[in-house]
Regions:
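Solvent-exposed, non-transmembrane amphipathic alpha-helical segments
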Residues: 43, 47, 64, 68, ...
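Short C-terminal domain-edge/linker segments immediately following a structured domain
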Residues: 13-16, 44-47, 91-92, 157-161, ...
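Acyl-donor binding region in acyl/amide transferases
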Residues: 119, 124-126, 130-198
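A conserved beta-strand-loop-helix scaffold within acyl/acetyltransferase catalytic domains
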Residues: 1-148, 163
Length: 233
């Protein structure tokens, strides 16, 4: 919750949307950064359209307004600097005040490249959730560097969780990763820990099994994937 509260510093706006294109752009960013293969735009669009027929899907977007945020940050920074110059900060609060100044200066550095480019706001994180009549699942999420900096990822998960609670769903499944939650493989242990902090219970399901309908391709595909990943590196 500490990270969710951090997102309040950036006046994020959370809206539900039908914008698959922006979501796809964001998840491609994650795929390139974290070395996984995202599906095509057509796949996500088809998925969304089919689930939307039954009102079993929602997209939660986190939007930031760089111009407003820069102006707000400049004002807060100036006020703190003036208080220090005028000796208005008690000694016991001086360290925290200087840390706040560093944070504000960093925010200006991060957001300045986006100034005067997004008057209607910039979507920095997009989360797709699916639903049945009694349960909710988070499925796909994409974000850019601003989404990471502003804790928009945590905020989107939190807002989807609140939405599930407000709509009286019996449970909200954050999904997980394959295998041991303490694994050292890639960032899977960190992903488990990230989701655990939302207060849920870790449940190990039976697992997934392949239904093989093309045996030849089934044998060849792992080798092709290995070659693909080697070339990509």
């Amino acid at each position: 919750m500490k990270t969710v509260r951090k997102s309040n510093n950036y006046d994020l706006e959370i809206k539900q949307s039908d914008d698959i294109k922006t979501f796809h752009d964001l998840i491609l960013n994650n795929a390139n950064k974290n070395d996984f293969k995202a599906y095509s735009l057509n796949y996500y669009q088809s998925f969304y359209d089919n689930f939307k027929k039954y009102n079993h899907v929602k997209i939660f977007n986190a939007i930031v307004y760089p111009d407003k945020l820069i102006k707000k940050t400049q004002t807060e920074l100036k006020e703190l600097q003036q208080k220090i110059e005028n000796n208005q900060i008690p000694e016991k609060r001086m360290a925290n005040t200087k840390n706040s100044i560093k944070r504000l200066e960093k925010d200006l550095e991060v957001f300045s490249p986006y100034q005067n480019k997004y008057p209607d706001g910039k979507i920095i994180c997009s989360l797709i959730c699916s639903y049945t009549n009694h349960a909710a699942w988070t499925l796909y999420i994409g974000n850019d560097s601003l989404g990471t900096h502003t804790a928009a990822v945590n905020r989107c998960y939190y807002e989807a969780l609140k939405d599930a609670y407000d709509n009286n769903y019996e449970f909200y499944d954050l999904f997980g990763t394959i295998g041991d939650p303490k694994t050292t493989y890639k960032n899977l242990a960190g992903l488990h820990e990230f989701k655990r902090k939302f207060g849920g219970e870790y449940i190990e399901f039976l697992g997934e099994f392949d239904l093989i309908n093309k045996p030849v391709w089934y044998k060849i595909l792992p080798h092709l994937l290995k070659i693909y990943r080697t070339l990509k590196k």
